[in-house]
Amino acid sequence: LDTNIASDITKWFTVKGSIKYIRNVSDTEHGQPWMGNFLLVPSIMVAQQSNGEWGSIAGGKQATQSFITGNPLRALSNKNWSKSKTEETMYDLGFDIKPVKGLVISGQGVFRGQEYKGKSYTALQDEVKTFETGTPIGGTGTYTNSMSMNWSSVTRMLYTGTIKYDWSNSIHNITALAGTSYEHYKYEALSAGRKNFPSDALEDLNGGSNAGKDLSNGGGMTEYKILSYFGRINYSLMDRYLLEANIRADASSRFYKDNRWGYFPSFSAGWRISQEEFMKNISWINNLKIRASWGTLGNINNVGNYDYFQNYNLGSDYNFNDEAVKGILESKPANLGLGWETVALTDFGVDIDLFDNKLSIVADYYIKNTSDILLGYNVPVETGIWSAPSQNIGKVKNTGFEMALTYRGNVGDLKYTVTGNIATNKNKVVDLAGSDDIISNGGGKIRFLFREGETIGSFY
Protein backbone atom coordinates (compact mmCIF):
# COMPACT_ATOMS: atom_id res chain seq x y z
CA LEU A 1 0.00 0.00 0.00
CA ASP A 2 1.43 3.36 -1.05
CA THR A 3 -0.54 6.60 -0.78
CA ASN A 4 0.60 10.17 -1.41
CA ILE A 5 -1.32 13.34 -0.65
CA ALA A 6 -0.72 17.04 -1.31
CA SER A 7 -3.20 19.83 -0.83
CA ASP A 8 -3.20 23.62 -0.90
CA ILE A 9 -5.56 24.38 1.97
CA THR A 10 -5.18 28.11 1.29
CA LYS A 11 -2.85 30.24 -0.80
CA TRP A 12 -0.43 30.33 2.12
CA PHE A 13 -0.94 26.89 3.73
CA THR A 14 0.02 23.58 2.11
CA VAL A 15 0.02 20.06 3.54
CA LYS A 16 1.66 17.00 2.06
CA GLY A 17 2.37 13.46 3.08
CA SER A 18 2.57 9.80 2.27
CA ILE A 19 1.59 6.54 3.91
CA LYS A 20 3.22 3.22 3.07
CA TYR A 21 2.41 -0.24 4.37
CA ILE A 22 4.31 -3.41 3.47
CA ARG A 23 3.43 -6.91 4.70
CA ASN A 24 5.50 -10.01 3.97
CA VAL A 25 4.34 -13.47 5.05
CA SER A 26 6.36 -16.67 4.74
CA ASP A 27 5.05 -20.18 5.47
CA THR A 28 7.45 -22.97 4.57
CA GLU A 29 6.81 -26.64 5.21
CA HIS A 30 9.22 -29.55 5.05
CA GLY A 31 12.91 -29.02 4.53
CA GLN A 32 14.62 -26.06 3.01
CA PRO A 33 17.68 -27.42 1.21
CA TRP A 34 20.37 -24.89 0.55
CA MET A 35 20.18 -24.33 -3.19
CA GLY A 36 23.95 -24.43 -3.44
CA ASN A 37 23.87 -28.11 -2.46
CA PHE A 38 22.27 -28.96 -5.79
CA LEU A 39 25.51 -27.79 -7.36
CA LEU A 40 27.97 -29.00 -4.72
CA VAL A 41 26.75 -32.56 -4.22
CA PRO A 42 28.60 -34.64 -6.84
CA SER A 43 26.60 -36.52 -9.45
CA ILE A 44 28.34 -39.74 -8.41
CA MET A 45 26.67 -39.63 -5.00
CA VAL A 46 23.63 -41.87 -4.52
CA ALA A 47 20.75 -39.69 -3.25
CA GLN A 48 18.72 -42.70 -2.04
CA GLN A 49 19.71 -46.34 -1.83
CA SER A 50 17.85 -49.16 -3.57
CA ASN A 51 16.68 -50.41 -0.15
CA GLY A 52 15.00 -47.07 0.63
CA GLU A 53 17.70 -45.79 2.97
CA TRP A 54 19.24 -42.41 2.30
CA GLY A 55 22.32 -42.33 0.18
CA SER A 56 25.74 -42.72 1.77
CA ILE A 57 27.79 -43.74 -1.25
CA ALA A 58 29.75 -41.47 -3.60
CA GLY A 59 31.85 -43.00 -6.35
CA GLY A 60 31.72 -46.46 -4.77
CA LYS A 61 32.93 -45.19 -1.38
CA GLN A 62 31.21 -43.82 1.70
CA ALA A 63 30.54 -40.10 1.22
CA THR A 64 31.77 -37.50 3.66
CA GLN A 65 29.47 -36.38 6.46
CA SER A 66 29.02 -32.94 4.90
CA PHE A 67 27.81 -34.46 1.62
CA ILE A 68 25.43 -36.80 3.42
CA THR A 69 23.83 -34.05 5.53
CA GLY A 70 23.70 -31.82 2.45
CA ASN A 71 21.66 -34.32 0.44
CA PRO A 72 18.90 -32.04 -1.01
CA LEU A 73 16.45 -34.92 -1.47
CA ARG A 74 16.78 -35.91 2.19
CA ALA A 75 16.38 -32.30 3.33
CA LEU A 76 13.06 -32.12 1.47
CA SER A 77 11.75 -35.17 3.35
CA ASN A 78 11.99 -33.86 6.90
CA LYS A 79 9.14 -32.32 8.88
CA ASN A 80 10.76 -28.99 9.63
CA TRP A 81 8.69 -25.84 9.15
CA SER A 82 8.99 -22.11 9.61
CA LYS A 83 6.52 -19.23 9.63
CA SER A 84 7.19 -15.52 9.72
CA LYS A 85 5.44 -12.21 9.24
CA THR A 86 7.00 -8.79 8.76
CA GLU A 87 4.96 -5.60 8.78
CA GLU A 88 6.44 -2.22 7.93
CA THR A 89 4.65 1.11 8.17
CA MET A 90 5.90 4.57 7.24
CA TYR A 91 4.15 7.90 7.74
CA ASP A 92 5.59 11.08 6.25
CA LEU A 93 3.59 14.23 6.96
CA GLY A 94 4.59 17.85 6.41
CA PHE A 95 3.34 21.38 5.93
CA ASP A 96 4.44 24.74 4.50
CA ILE A 97 3.15 28.10 5.74
CA LYS A 98 3.86 31.27 3.74
CA PRO A 99 2.43 34.14 5.80
CA VAL A 100 4.32 36.92 3.98
CA LYS A 101 6.42 37.21 0.86
CA GLY A 102 9.77 35.45 1.20
CA LEU A 103 8.95 33.72 4.50
CA VAL A 104 8.34 29.96 4.63
CA ILE A 105 7.65 28.00 7.82
CA SER A 106 7.97 24.25 7.27
CA GLY A 107 7.50 21.18 9.40
CA GLN A 108 7.89 17.48 8.72
CA GLY A 109 7.39 14.34 10.75
CA VAL A 110 8.50 10.89 9.64
CA PHE A 111 7.67 7.68 11.47
CA ARG A 112 8.89 4.28 10.39
CA GLY A 113 8.04 1.09 12.23
CA GLN A 114 8.87 -2.52 11.49
CA GLU A 115 7.67 -5.56 13.42
CA TYR A 116 8.82 -9.14 12.87
CA LYS A 117 7.25 -12.32 14.24
CA GLY A 118 8.71 -15.72 13.50
CA LYS A 119 8.27 -19.32 14.62
CA SER A 120 10.23 -22.35 13.46
CA TYR A 121 10.33 -26.06 14.25
CA THR A 122 13.13 -28.58 13.78
CA ALA A 123 11.90 -32.18 13.70
CA LEU A 124 13.68 -35.37 14.62
CA GLN A 125 15.55 -37.08 11.79
CA ASP A 126 17.21 -40.46 11.94
CA GLU A 127 20.88 -40.88 11.19
CA VAL A 128 21.86 -42.10 7.75
CA LYS A 129 23.02 -45.71 7.71
CA THR A 130 25.90 -47.14 5.75
CA PHE A 131 24.72 -49.18 2.77
CA GLU A 132 26.97 -52.17 3.47
CA THR A 133 26.48 -52.71 7.22
CA GLY A 134 23.45 -50.61 8.16
CA THR A 135 25.49 -48.89 10.87
CA PRO A 136 24.28 -45.34 11.71
CA ILE A 137 26.71 -42.61 10.70
CA GLY A 138 27.29 -40.20 13.57
CA GLY A 139 26.47 -36.54 13.06
CA THR A 140 23.96 -37.12 10.26
CA GLY A 141 20.77 -37.01 12.32
CA THR A 142 18.74 -34.55 14.38
CA TYR A 143 18.52 -36.03 17.86
CA THR A 144 16.30 -33.48 19.62
CA ASN A 145 13.31 -31.70 18.17
CA SER A 146 12.88 -28.03 19.07
CA MET A 147 10.75 -24.96 18.48
CA SER A 148 11.71 -21.30 18.68
CA MET A 149 9.77 -18.04 18.55
CA ASN A 150 11.25 -14.63 17.76
CA TRP A 151 9.86 -11.11 17.90
CA SER A 152 11.54 -7.82 17.10
CA SER A 153 10.45 -4.23 16.69
CA VAL A 154 12.27 -1.27 15.15
CA THR A 155 10.90 2.27 15.34
CA ARG A 156 12.47 5.45 14.04
CA MET A 157 10.97 8.92 14.42
CA LEU A 158 12.33 12.09 12.85
CA TYR A 159 10.85 15.56 13.29
CA THR A 160 12.15 18.66 11.51
CA GLY A 161 11.03 22.28 11.67
CA THR A 162 12.51 25.21 9.73
CA ILE A 163 11.95 28.91 9.14
CA LYS A 164 13.37 30.32 5.90
CA TYR A 165 13.42 33.90 4.67
CA ASP A 166 14.52 35.17 1.24
CA TRP A 167 15.02 38.83 0.31
CA SER A 168 16.60 40.32 -2.77
CA ASN A 169 16.81 43.39 -4.98
CA SER A 170 18.88 44.24 -8.03
CA ILE A 171 22.12 44.22 -6.00
CA HIS A 172 21.68 42.17 -2.84
CA ASN A 173 20.36 38.70 -2.16
CA ILE A 174 19.95 37.34 1.37
CA THR A 175 18.69 33.93 2.47
CA ALA A 176 18.39 32.99 6.15
CA LEU A 177 17.40 29.63 7.59
CA ALA A 178 16.88 28.42 11.17
CA GLY A 179 15.63 25.04 12.27
CA THR A 180 15.59 22.15 14.66
CA SER A 181 15.38 18.37 14.33
CA TYR A 182 14.84 15.44 16.66
CA GLU A 183 15.52 11.76 15.98
CA HIS A 184 14.59 8.78 18.14
CA TYR A 185 15.55 5.20 17.26
CA LYS A 186 14.58 2.12 19.28
CA TYR A 187 15.09 -1.61 18.75
CA GLU A 188 13.59 -4.37 20.91
CA ALA A 189 13.74 -8.15 20.56
CA LEU A 190 12.51 -11.23 22.40
CA SER A 191 13.10 -14.92 21.79
CA ALA A 192 11.99 -18.16 23.43
CA GLY A 193 12.49 -21.83 22.72
CA ARG A 194 11.74 -25.34 23.94
CA LYS A 195 12.97 -28.82 23.13
CA ASN A 196 11.66 -32.40 23.29
CA PHE A 197 8.16 -32.17 21.84
CA PRO A 198 6.15 -35.42 22.10
CA SER A 199 4.73 -34.98 18.58
CA ASP A 200 5.59 -33.15 15.38
CA ALA A 201 1.92 -32.15 15.15
CA LEU A 202 2.21 -29.69 18.04
CA GLU A 203 2.62 -26.07 16.93
CA ASP A 204 2.39 -24.42 20.36
CA LEU A 205 5.57 -23.61 22.26
CA ASN A 206 3.99 -24.89 25.49
CA GLY A 207 3.91 -28.37 23.98
CA GLY A 208 7.63 -28.79 24.63
CA SER A 209 9.37 -30.05 27.74
CA ASN A 210 9.26 -27.99 30.96
CA ALA A 211 12.69 -29.19 32.09
CA GLY A 212 15.15 -26.35 32.67
CA LYS A 213 17.68 -27.81 30.24
CA ASP A 214 15.06 -27.72 27.49
CA LEU A 215 14.06 -24.08 27.97
CA SER A 216 15.72 -21.01 26.47
CA ASN A 217 14.92 -17.33 26.24
CA GLY A 218 16.64 -14.11 25.32
CA GLY A 219 16.10 -10.54 24.36
CA GLY A 220 17.67 -7.18 23.82
CA MET A 221 17.01 -3.48 23.49
CA THR A 222 18.93 -0.48 22.23
CA GLU A 223 17.98 3.12 21.48
CA TYR A 224 19.44 6.55 20.87
CA LYS A 225 18.21 10.12 20.55
CA ILE A 226 19.66 13.14 18.75
CA LEU A 227 18.48 16.74 19.15
CA SER A 228 19.81 19.42 16.79
CA TYR A 229 19.52 23.15 16.21
CA PHE A 230 20.95 24.73 13.07
CA GLY A 231 21.12 28.01 11.22
CA ARG A 232 22.45 29.30 7.91
CA ILE A 233 22.73 32.68 6.22
CA ASN A 234 23.73 33.33 2.60
CA TYR A 235 24.62 36.71 1.15
CA SER A 236 25.30 37.59 -2.49
CA LEU A 237 26.39 40.99 -3.78
CA MET A 238 25.68 41.51 -7.48
CA ASP A 239 25.99 37.74 -7.89
CA ARG A 240 29.77 38.22 -7.70
CA TYR A 241 30.71 38.17 -4.05
CA LEU A 242 29.30 35.26 -2.08
CA LEU A 243 29.29 34.63 1.67
CA GLU A 244 27.79 31.83 3.73
CA ALA A 245 27.80 31.11 7.48
CA ASN A 246 26.46 28.02 9.26
CA ILE A 247 26.13 26.89 12.84
CA ARG A 248 24.98 23.54 14.26
CA ALA A 249 24.40 22.44 17.82
CA ASP A 250 23.88 18.70 18.26
CA ALA A 251 23.15 16.67 21.38
CA SER A 252 23.35 12.87 21.46
CA SER A 253 22.17 10.39 24.08
CA ARG A 254 25.33 8.38 23.39
CA PHE A 255 27.23 10.74 25.69
CA TYR A 256 26.92 11.50 29.40
CA LYS A 257 24.46 14.31 30.14
CA ASP A 258 27.21 16.86 30.91
CA ASN A 259 29.01 16.19 27.63
CA ARG A 260 26.26 15.67 25.07
CA TRP A 261 26.39 18.94 23.15
CA GLY A 262 28.70 19.65 20.26
CA TYR A 263 28.90 22.97 18.38
CA PHE A 264 30.00 23.07 14.76
CA PRO A 265 30.34 26.37 12.85
CA SER A 266 31.36 26.80 9.21
CA PHE A 267 32.05 29.70 6.84
CA SER A 268 32.64 30.07 3.11
CA ALA A 269 33.32 32.84 0.62
CA GLY A 270 33.39 32.97 -3.16
CA TRP A 271 34.27 35.47 -5.88
CA ARG A 272 32.91 35.13 -9.42
CA ILE A 273 35.72 36.90 -11.20
CA SER A 274 34.10 36.27 -14.57
CA GLN A 275 31.30 38.68 -13.60
CA GLU A 276 33.70 41.61 -13.19
CA GLU A 277 33.80 44.36 -15.82
CA PHE A 278 37.46 43.71 -16.67
CA MET A 279 36.51 40.14 -17.72
CA LYS A 280 33.71 41.06 -20.14
CA ASN A 281 35.94 41.08 -23.21
CA ILE A 282 37.50 37.67 -22.52
CA SER A 283 34.90 35.63 -24.36
CA TRP A 284 36.61 32.24 -24.07
CA ILE A 285 36.24 32.29 -20.27
CA ASN A 286 32.59 31.61 -19.45
CA ASN A 287 32.98 31.17 -15.71
CA LEU A 288 35.82 31.80 -13.29
CA LYS A 289 35.15 31.46 -9.58
CA ILE A 290 37.52 31.18 -6.65
CA ARG A 291 36.32 30.04 -3.25
CA ALA A 292 37.51 29.34 0.26
CA SER A 293 35.83 27.64 3.18
CA TRP A 294 36.40 26.50 6.73
CA GLY A 295 34.03 24.37 8.73
CA THR A 296 33.64 21.75 11.42
CA LEU A 297 31.59 18.58 11.60
CA GLY A 298 30.82 16.19 14.42
CA ASN A 299 31.07 12.41 14.16
CA ILE A 300 29.54 9.75 16.41
CA ASN A 301 29.68 6.78 14.03
CA ASN A 302 32.36 5.11 16.18
CA VAL A 303 30.40 5.56 19.42
CA GLY A 304 28.07 2.88 20.75
CA ASN A 305 24.74 3.71 22.31
CA TYR A 306 25.98 2.89 25.82
CA ASP A 307 29.75 3.30 25.63
CA TYR A 308 29.90 5.76 28.52
CA PHE A 309 28.21 3.34 30.94
CA GLN A 310 30.10 1.35 33.56
CA ASN A 311 30.02 -2.39 32.78
CA TYR A 312 29.91 -5.32 35.18
CA ASN A 313 30.34 -9.05 34.63
CA LEU A 314 27.81 -10.99 36.71
CA GLY A 315 29.43 -14.38 36.11
CA SER A 316 32.69 -13.67 37.92
CA ASP A 317 32.85 -16.51 40.45
CA TYR A 318 35.77 -16.71 42.87
CA ASN A 319 37.11 -19.14 45.47
CA PHE A 320 36.50 -18.52 49.18
CA ASN A 321 37.28 -21.20 51.77
CA ASP A 322 37.56 -23.75 48.98
CA GLU A 323 34.05 -22.98 47.76
CA ALA A 324 32.86 -21.20 44.62
CA VAL A 325 31.21 -17.89 45.47
CA LYS A 326 29.14 -15.80 43.08
CA GLY A 327 30.77 -12.48 42.29
CA ILE A 328 30.45 -9.30 40.27
CA LEU A 329 33.44 -7.81 38.47
CA GLU A 330 33.82 -4.37 36.95
CA SER A 331 34.76 -5.23 33.38
CA LYS A 332 34.83 -1.66 32.03
CA PRO A 333 34.88 1.62 33.97
CA ALA A 334 32.52 4.48 33.25
CA ASN A 335 33.63 6.87 30.52
CA LEU A 336 31.84 10.11 31.38
CA GLY A 337 34.30 12.22 29.38
CA LEU A 338 33.41 10.57 26.08
CA GLY A 339 32.65 13.21 23.46
CA TRP A 340 32.28 14.10 19.80
CA GLU A 341 34.97 13.49 17.24
CA THR A 342 35.48 16.77 15.39
CA VAL A 343 36.57 17.30 11.80
CA ALA A 344 37.83 20.77 10.80
CA LEU A 345 38.14 21.19 7.03
CA THR A 346 39.83 24.10 5.26
CA ASP A 347 39.40 24.21 1.49
CA PHE A 348 40.61 26.48 -1.31
CA GLY A 349 39.14 25.90 -4.75
CA VAL A 350 38.58 27.22 -8.24
CA ASP A 351 35.83 26.54 -10.81
CA ILE A 352 36.53 27.32 -14.47
CA ASP A 353 34.37 26.89 -17.58
CA LEU A 354 36.00 27.61 -20.95
CA PHE A 355 35.25 27.67 -24.68
CA ASP A 356 31.45 27.96 -24.55
CA ASN A 357 31.36 25.68 -21.47
CA LYS A 358 32.93 22.80 -23.38
CA LEU A 359 35.83 22.47 -20.93
CA SER A 360 35.27 22.53 -17.16
CA ILE A 361 37.97 22.50 -14.49
CA VAL A 362 37.32 22.04 -10.77
CA ALA A 363 40.34 22.06 -8.45
CA ASP A 364 40.59 21.95 -4.65
CA TYR A 365 43.35 21.97 -2.07
CA TYR A 366 42.25 20.91 1.40
CA ILE A 367 43.54 20.59 4.94
CA LYS A 368 41.53 18.24 7.11
CA ASN A 369 42.24 18.05 10.84
CA THR A 370 40.40 15.37 12.80
CA SER A 371 40.62 15.74 16.56
CA ASP A 372 39.27 13.88 19.59
CA ILE A 373 39.45 10.59 17.67
CA LEU A 374 38.26 7.64 19.74
CA LEU A 375 41.12 5.26 20.45
CA GLY A 376 41.77 2.60 23.04
CA TYR A 377 44.53 2.93 25.61
CA ASN A 378 46.59 0.54 27.69
CA VAL A 379 45.37 -0.26 31.20
CA PRO A 380 47.63 -1.85 33.87
CA VAL A 381 46.90 -5.55 34.33
CA GLU A 382 46.57 -5.13 38.09
CA THR A 383 43.37 -3.09 37.63
CA GLY A 384 41.53 -6.26 36.66
CA ILE A 385 39.75 -4.40 33.88
CA TRP A 386 39.10 -6.57 30.85
CA SER A 387 38.15 -3.87 28.38
CA ALA A 388 39.39 -0.30 28.62
CA PRO A 389 36.98 2.32 27.29
CA SER A 390 37.99 4.37 24.28
CA GLN A 391 38.97 7.98 24.83
CA ASN A 392 39.03 11.10 22.65
CA ILE A 393 42.81 11.20 22.41
CA GLY A 394 43.74 11.07 18.73
CA LYS A 395 44.54 13.81 16.24
CA VAL A 396 45.12 13.17 12.53
CA LYS A 397 45.95 15.61 9.74
CA ASN A 398 45.14 15.06 6.07
CA THR A 399 46.23 17.31 3.22
CA GLY A 400 45.52 16.81 -0.42
CA PHE A 401 44.76 18.12 -3.88
CA GLU A 402 41.90 17.13 -6.17
CA MET A 403 41.21 18.16 -9.75
CA ALA A 404 38.57 17.11 -12.27
CA LEU A 405 38.56 18.01 -15.98
CA THR A 406 35.46 17.54 -18.11
CA TYR A 407 35.18 18.06 -21.86
CA ARG A 408 31.84 18.09 -23.69
CA GLY A 409 31.70 17.81 -27.45
CA ASN A 410 29.80 16.40 -30.34
CA VAL A 411 30.39 14.73 -33.69
CA GLY A 412 27.34 15.51 -35.77
CA ASP A 413 24.33 14.46 -33.71
CA LEU A 414 26.49 12.36 -31.39
CA LYS A 415 27.20 14.06 -28.08
CA TYR A 416 29.95 12.87 -25.74
CA THR A 417 31.49 13.78 -22.39
CA VAL A 418 34.99 12.89 -21.22
CA THR A 419 36.00 13.32 -17.57
CA GLY A 420 39.38 12.83 -15.92
CA ASN A 421 40.30 13.04 -12.23
CA ILE A 422 43.50 13.33 -10.25
CA ALA A 423 43.85 13.29 -6.47
CA THR A 424 46.60 13.17 -3.88
CA ASN A 425 46.36 12.73 -0.12
CA LYS A 426 48.87 12.70 2.70
CA ASN A 427 48.05 11.99 6.32
CA LYS A 428 49.83 11.56 9.60
CA VAL A 429 49.04 10.97 13.25
CA VAL A 430 49.64 14.31 14.97
CA ASP A 431 48.91 13.46 18.60
CA LEU A 432 48.01 10.45 20.74
CA ALA A 433 47.91 12.46 24.00
CA GLY A 434 50.96 10.70 25.38
CA SER A 435 49.54 7.24 24.79
CA ASP A 436 51.79 4.39 23.69
CA ASP A 437 51.77 3.20 20.10
CA ILE A 438 48.47 1.55 19.27
CA ILE A 439 48.59 -1.72 17.36
CA SER A 440 45.40 -3.02 15.76
CA ASN A 441 44.87 -6.32 13.96
CA GLY A 442 42.15 -4.78 11.79
CA GLY A 443 39.95 -7.80 12.34
CA GLY A 444 42.42 -10.15 10.64
CA LYS A 445 46.04 -11.30 10.62
CA ILE A 446 47.41 -8.03 9.24
CA ARG A 447 48.43 -5.59 11.97
CA PHE A 448 48.31 -1.80 11.76
CA LEU A 449 50.27 0.76 13.73
CA PHE A 450 49.14 4.14 15.06
CA ARG A 451 52.21 6.20 16.03
CA GLU A 452 52.72 9.94 16.30
CA GLY A 453 54.35 11.29 13.15
CA GLU A 454 53.51 8.21 11.08
CA THR A 455 50.80 7.62 8.50
CA ILE A 456 47.62 6.38 10.12
CA GLY A 457 47.12 2.63 9.75
CA SER A 458 50.73 1.85 8.75
CA PHE A 459 51.50 -1.84 8.32
CA TYR A 460 53.14 -3.30 11.42
Describe the function of each predicted region:
Residues M35-R74:
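Acidic, glycine-rich flexible loop segments
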Residues F131:
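Active-site-surrounding "flap" and adjacent substrate/cofactor-binding loops of secreted or lumenal enzymes
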Residues N4-R23, G31, S66-T122, T135-E454, ...:
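Extracellular/periplasmic, surface-exposed regions of secreted and cell-surface proteins
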